[in-house]
């Protein structure tokens, strides 16, 4: 539950049980949880809706099919990245995630984007070309750069 909503750690439960694992074992009352995610002033509301948006986008991408080809890309310890190709080989997605609390610059040349295709970040609709040299990812930012966009 905590991962879906970004809820706060339950330090009181840790103190009560004496177990560190209790930090994310809070039992939620349905109404309290609904109040958190339905109030657009709460960060839990934003996180829940953003997760839902990303799931909707992801479900429409052939390259995210469970049987699609996947390769891990190496951009250092602050970047978690992988490349996926749809079964029919029409769609490629470069999923690039900054897993650090600092901005990270990566070379788009290392992705080897095919110059004859248009490339779009599925999360922001930002366009990329094979001529773009690099991109800076903000802390914890993710990009899903695809050559074939399925509408969100």
Question: Which role fits each region the language model picked out?
Answer:
Residues 1-104, 109-110:
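Loop/helix patches that line or flank the sugar-binding groove of alpha-linked glycan CAZymes
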Residues 103-123:
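Beta-strand-rich binding/interaction modules
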Residues 124-129:
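Short beta-strand and strand-turn-strand segments in soluble, beta-rich domains
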Residues 130-152:
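C-terminal beta-strand-rich structural cap/linker in extracellular carbohydrate-active enzymes
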Residues 54, 119, 140:
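A residue-level signal for conserved active-site and pocket-lining positions in enzyme catalytic cores
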Residues 28, 97, 120, 131-132, ...:
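Intrinsic-disorder/low-complexity regions
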């Amino acid at each position: 539950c905590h991962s879906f909503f970004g809820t706060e750690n339950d330090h009181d439960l840790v103190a009560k049980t004496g177990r560190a694992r209790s930090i994310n074992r809070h039992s939620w009352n349905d109404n309290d949880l609904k109040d958190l995610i339905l109030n657009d002033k709460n960060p839990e509301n934003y996180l829940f809706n953003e997760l839902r948006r990303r799931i909707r986008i992801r479900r429409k991408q052939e390259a995210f099919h469970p049987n699609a080809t996947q390769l891990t890309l190496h951009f250092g310890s602050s970047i978690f990245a992988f490349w996926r190709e749809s079964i029919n080989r029409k769609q490629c997605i470069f999923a690039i995630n900054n897993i650090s609390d600092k901005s990270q610059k990566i070379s788009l040349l290392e992705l080897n984007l095919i110059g004859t295709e248009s490339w779009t970040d599925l999360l922001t609709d930002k366009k990329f070309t094979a001529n773009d040299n690099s991109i800076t990812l903000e802390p914890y930012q993710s990009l899903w750069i695809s050559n074939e966009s399925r509408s969100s």
